[in-house]
Design a protein with these regions (language model features):
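Extended alpha-helical interface modules used as scaffolds for assembling large macromolecular complexes
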Residues: 259, 264-478, 482-484, 495, ...
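Mid-core helix/loop region of P-loop NTP-binding domains shared across ATPases and GTPases
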Residues: 105-148, 152, 175-182
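Short, small-residue-biased leader/transition segments that mark boundaries at the very start
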Residues: 2-8
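Substrate-engagement module of ASCE P-loop NTPases
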Residues: 135-137, 166-188, 488
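Amphipathic alpha-helical segments of the small helical/lid subdomains adjacent to P-loop NTPase cores
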Residues: 200-206, 211-267, 300-301
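Walker A/P-loop nucleotide-binding motif
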Residues: 32-47
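Flexible phosphate/Mg2+-sensing switch loops adjacent to catalytic phosphate-binding sites
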Residues: 53-80, 125, 437-439
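Pre-Walker A adenine-sensing motif
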Residues: 16-26
């Protein structure tokens, strides 16, 4: 537990509710946890916190006093009471000269520490870690808490090395599989980016409960920052919460809006609204993924860049980086990497926030997609026509974009019209934040509201857009006025355009009316 006191030197947010959960499952069949999250989400922080709380080698009561866990009845019952084996696979991989020997290095390192702690127990040579843990349990009655950080790094970084994977899977199987491990394991906590691999590692770890970016269940609020936590931080550090939300919000885990902690801490300390993602990860990591030649992949990326949600079947992804065979596999992997958010109720993927939108835009532009370049040109013409208040041209451009680029979306109702419109205004993403869908107003919900980024506010008005399917544009405009939609952004000080768009299924024409909103003096 050396150095674990550093964990709480800058305690931004209390995440000790995770300890409350792990205490509740100790020494049960639910005590096998695999908690996967993207980089920069505080996975190692959580692992260090658990080690600091449980480890006999730590004296951490003062560290946890005043935090949520200290108020629980069983706080002292488990505090610093266990032998904790804390393995950082990334560290071992980085410090192993030959990756083929990394599993041996892990085993030898842990065995060496066990011999130091229990010199009288190991009177003969023990070469397998599970055997050593069983001996300690038999001689002392002591069970272990095993924490493995970056558990999946050998699955990701050594994906093509079958020898290493086989050795590692056998190591995991020996540690966790069967009845013998239940005799020496009090808690097993694995954390990484990927969930358990569906083919090879599943047989070794199928007794683990999984908490992922697809389904975080009870652990949703404990990795990443919740909206309430970020709002509290924004007040404490005098930051504009709405702006923080636009830039860094967007991950949906269970019923929580989750923020990337790395980005939130960065903006609180530095006061700069920018992509902190690029400081610790290059867009080059995602570029090969979005350029894979799978039907519908580039279209899906373009749709999401424009603010739309895209259906994704997450069941086909094998949870490794080698067996990617479809658009859905790519999108699911991007969800686990944090480049996409996921709504488990609608089973759709989306770009979560402005920070990630910038990263993906750079990744797309780095390869100069022909599809993207041509589409952007048409979208720019649509935006220019909107700003020029040329309703006829807007109708013509929407029709052209629908017919030539996104005809796969057939008009059946207002929802399908809104999907086409969101994609058609893709070029607006350079100047505007992600459109707000169905923004609550005085007497209803506006279909779309586009708010310009601060640096473009002088030249680009806010847009309030109402859609009508199989009605006329005048009806859409009248609804904007009757239901007082502009009151939803009445504190916005720039210009506002009201945009009514309709589609007539009989004549198959788009109509558009645009008016400038005159604020009441």
């Amino acid at each position: 537990s050396r150095g674990l006191g550093d964990v709480y030197k800058r305690q931004y947010v209390d995440k000790t509710g995770l300890i409350e959960y792990t205490n509740s499952v100790l020494d049960t069949t639910d005590a096998y946890i695999c908690n996967s999250r993207p980089r920069r989400f505080g996975k190692s922080y959580a692992a260090n916190m658990l080690a600091a709380y449980y480890s006999k080698g730590a004296d951490s009561e003062k560290m946890f006093s005043g935090l949520q866990i200290s108020k629980e009845a069983d706080f002292r019952e488990h505090l610093n009471k266990y032998d904790v084996i804390h393995i950082d696979i990334q560290w071992f991989l980085a410090n192993c000269e030959d990756v083929d020997n990394v599993v041996t290095l892990i085993t030898d390192s842990v065995l060496s520490e066990l011999r130091e702690i229990y010199p009288d127990i190991f009177t003969w040579e023990v070469s397998r870690l599970p055997d050593a843990l069983s001996i300690v349990r038999e001689k002392t009655g002591q069970k272990f808490i095993i924490i493995i950080d970056e558990w999946d790094v050998l699955i990701r970084d050594a994906a093509t090395n079958g020898k290493v994977q086989e050795a590692y899977i056998n190591f995991l199987r020996g540690m966790f599989k069967g009845t013998e491990p239940t005799k020496y394991i009090q808690l097993a906590y694995l954390t990484g980016i990927l969930p358990v691999k569906k083919e090879k590692t599943q047989s070794a770890l199928n007794n683990f409960d999984e908490f992922t970016m697809l389904s975080a269940s009870n652990l949703a609020p404990y990795i990443g920052f919740t909206e309430d936590e970020v709002e509290k931080l924004s007040k404490e550090y005098h930051q504009d919460f709405d702006k923080v939300k636009r830039w860094y919000d967007g991950y949906l885990l269970k019923d929580y809006q989750i923020y990337n902690p790395r980005a939130v801490v960065g903006v609180m300390l530095k006061g700069e609204f920018k992509s902190y993602w690029s400081e610790t990860a290059s867009y080059e990591a995602v570029t090969p993924l979005i350029n894979m030649n799978y039907d519908g992949l580039k279209t899906a990326i373009i749709e999401m860049l424009s603010g739309a949600n895209v259906k994704v079947d997450t069941a086909t992804f094998k949870n490794d980086t080698v067996n990617i065979h479809s658009k859905d596999d790519v999108l699911t992997y991007m969800i686990h990497l944090g480049y996409l958010g996921y709504d488990q109720y609608t089973k759709t993927a989306f770009i979560p926030n402005e920070e990630i939108r910038q990263e993906l835009t750079v990744a797309v532009e780095s390869r100069s997609w022909n599809e993207m370049l041509m589409f952007q040109q048409e979208s720019e013409r649509l935006l220019d026509a909107t700003l020029d208040m040329d309703g006829v041209m807007v109708g013509t451009q929407i029709e052209k974009i629908h017919n030539e680029y996104i005809s796969v979306i057939q008009y059946h109702n207002e929802n399908s019209l809104s999907s086409v419109l969101a994609i058609a205004y893709l070029s607006a993403m350079q100047y505007y934040f992600k459109p707000i869908r169905e923004l609550p107003t005085g007497r209803g919900f506006a279909d779309f509201v586009y708010i310009p980024k601060p640096e473009y506010k002088a030249d680009y008005p806010a847009l309030i857009v109402e859609l009508k399917w199989n009605q006329n544009a005048q009806t859409a405009m009248q609804q904007i006025k009757n239901k007082k939609y502009p009151t939803a952004i009445e504190n916005y000080t720039g210009d506002i355009l009201l945009v009514g768009i309709s589609y007539d299924k009989n004549c198959k024409e788009h109509q558009c009316l645009i008016e400038k909103y005159e604020k009441e003096s």
